Structure formats: structure tokens, C-alpha cells
Amino acid sequence: MGSLFDGIGGFPLAAERCGIKPLWASEIEPFPIEVTKHHFPDMIHVGDITLLNGAELPPVDIICGGSPCQDLSVAGARAGLAGARSGLFMEQIRIVKEMRQAEIERGHTGVNIRPRYMVWENVPGAFSSGEPKGEDFRIVLDEIVHVVCPSSHVNQWFSYGWQQVGWHYEDNKCSLAWRCLDAQYWGVAQRRKRIFLVADFAGPTAPLLLFDALPNQEVKNES
């Protein structure tokens, strides 16, 4: 696993507990880097995300990232993905594309193209940010689907906004699923809701991974 916007290593900690090796991390703040160096001494620190080339990074099966949330948060100025901080989400997409293209050029195909999976975490304000309301989250879904299906388009399904749980299939080419989780139910003594989105770039397993079950095909939310 590779961790972008790594902070103090939340994704590497979760990965390690699940038997997944955190191979490298991108972070620019000195103190968080020292924290992760202490807890994950074998993890490579690759530096500023804007200076990275996905084709040159060690290939990983999963790329995780919680891109800066300030421009999406209801507590901020709501600049959305056009903001300098939350707009860094596009750097995560760029790196995924660059790594996958390099893998294709090495002769890998199908499920063997890395990264197969991407995980994105952010604030629930992403559901309502943008114009029209919720457009930023639609763009997030669009950009993730475009990694493998560049001509596809994800529509906003509900005029009153996005649901806190949803999924999308692009034939058998890729799938993505998201859910809003509250830290108070996961061993943390505070209320802290966050969106967690999983994408599978080679199959239909994203809902299975995030929900531990495939959604009912008759009621799935598809564009």
C-alpha cells in the first residue's frame, strides 16, 4: 500500500493490522513524518505529492489518501475542488493513472495492473460542496471512474443531494462504493463523521469490500 497525504500514518496503521504492507508514504509536515518513521521504520517517505511521478514510485496494490478537506468542509469557505488544498485530490488521481500506465507498459493486464484499488477519505461536506449542490462529489466519482473508463460519466442521482451510502458499477470494468462513518462507533471518544470511498479498477468488488456484502442489484444506485 502507498499512502498519500499520510499525516501520522492512519492508513498504514490500518493496513498493517490487516496484514497489508505499507510500502511508501507522501507527507510534507516534519512532525507527522517523524511519528511515522518511529512506528513504520521500513516505510519509504517520498515527499511532496505535487513533485511525485506515479510511474517512478514503487508499484503498490492499493493507493490510499485523505486529500485536504478545508475547501470542502461546511466550516470553511467552501471553495470546493477549485480550492488550492482540496484540489490536491486531482494529484492523487494523476499518480494512480501514471502508475497504472507504467504497469501497462511493463506488460501487465487486467487485475495485475497496479494499483488495482484506491481508497479516498474526506469530510461529509463533499456531499454538498460545489454548484449545483453536490457537484464536487460527482466530480470525484467521475474522475475515479475515468481512470479506466475515460468516456464514462457519473450523474448525480438525487436532486436533494447525495446519500451517505452508495455505489456505482461500470459494467465489469470497475466499481466504487462509499459510506459515511462516525468515529464514535469505532473506538474514538468523539463524534467525527468521514466519507470512506473504495474503488476497484478491475472488477465489481468495491461494494463487497466496503459493505462486506454485494448490494441488492435491484436497488443499487447507478447513473
What are these regions (language model features)?
Residues 45-52:
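Glycine-rich, highly charged phosphate/nucleotide-binding loops
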Residues 10, 14-21, 39:
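A short, Lys/Arg-enriched amphipathic alpha-helix followed by its capping loop at the start of a domain
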Residues 25-26:
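The conserved SAM/SAH-binding core of class I Rossmann-like methyltransferase domains
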Residues 3-9:
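Class I SAM-dependent methyltransferase "Motif I" SAM/SAH-binding loop
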Residues 60-66:
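Short SAM/SAH-binding signature in class I
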